[in-house]
Amino acid sequence: MNILPIMEKFFTIQGEGSHTGKAAYFIRIAGCDVGCVWCDVKESWERHEHQETEISELIESAKASKCNFVVITGGEPAMYDLTLLIDGLKAEGIYCAIETSGCYPLKGSIDWYCFSPKKFKLPCEEAYTKADELKIIINHPSDFAWAEEHAKKVKEDCALFLQAEWSKNEKILPQIIDYVKSNPRWRISLQTHKYMQIP
């Protein structure tokens, strides 16, 4: 696939997960059929509302940022064959990460696989073996048990993160803090970009 539907691309700071605080060039691919009710980028769901962009243009824009770390996100980016995009970025010496629900097998050899499963659509089995990072959004206290079910299936060295659903942050974050203190293999992911008021 030489073109992809792109909602936006921008240079910022990665705000969450293992790479928090790093300068990062984001490529947000449009299109998602997972349907998280609390999604903060619902405008990314409809691919046909966004411009089809040449992969070569995406690679050039990432190069122009002079950032050697690209995050491919969505939407659900794994809906598409990302081989040409990932290979093209890596050929330029750019480290590539993806943020995915794991609902689709990934086409492309990614450097960092952030797996954030959702209850609305079950992930495929390969997501558990590929995951470098498991990030669970905590929306309700019952989600802690759900997080543990997924943690049992990932690799032993997979980084484990719990992140509060943003609209419930004040209520949920204290519960996450207590949980991580009692279960220290988990770490807290804060959406620090929202505190910094950056994209």
Question: Can you say where each PLM-predicted feature lies in the sequence?
Answer:
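Conserved Radical SAM active-site core
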Residues: 4-7, 11, 23-24, 30, ...
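A short beta-strand-turn-helix
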Residues: 13-17
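Histidine (H) residue identity feature
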Residues: 19, 48-50, 150, 193
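A generic structural micro-feature
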Residues: 19-21, 128
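Conserved AdoMet/S-adenosylmethionine-binding subsite of the radical SAM
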Residues: 78-199
